[in-house]
Amino acid sequence: MNETEFHKLVDIQMQNIEEAIDESEADIDYEVTGNVMTLEFENRSQIIINRQEPMREIWLASKSGGFHFKLVDDKWTCSKTGMALFEMVKEECEKHADEEINWV
């Protein structure tokens, strides 16, 4: 995958995360600055998601630790857990919010 394809695919993931947060009506603020998306919760905890262009990866940092995602079979997959990026984002958001979130 070249640089342009990588950015296009990551942009889609970031957009999906934003839309899911909006549709869930959860109290999660998000901001995208450059290559970094910051999710902030009512308790001021944060999840940081950023693109690592040189390695063609998406990295996620939360209170559970740091995770690296590579595109495997058209799915962003964690190198540690095998979990899909979107599923981990949802799981980590619920941990940070300390409540179940109604994901649509």
Curated annotation (Swiss-Prot):
One of its GO terms (cellular component) is cytosol. Keywords: Iron, Metal-binding. GO terms for biological process: iron-sulfur cluster assembly. Pfam families: Frataxin_Cyay. It comes from the Bacteria. InterPro entries: CyaY, Frataxin/CyaY, Frataxin/CyaY_sf, Frataxin_CS. The keyword Membrane does not apply. GO terms for molecular function: ferric iron binding; ferrous iron binding. Belongs to the frataxin family. Involved in iron-sulfur (Fe-S) cluster assembly. May act as a regulator of Fe-S biogenesis. This is Iron-sulfur cluster assembly protein CyaY. The gene is cyaY.
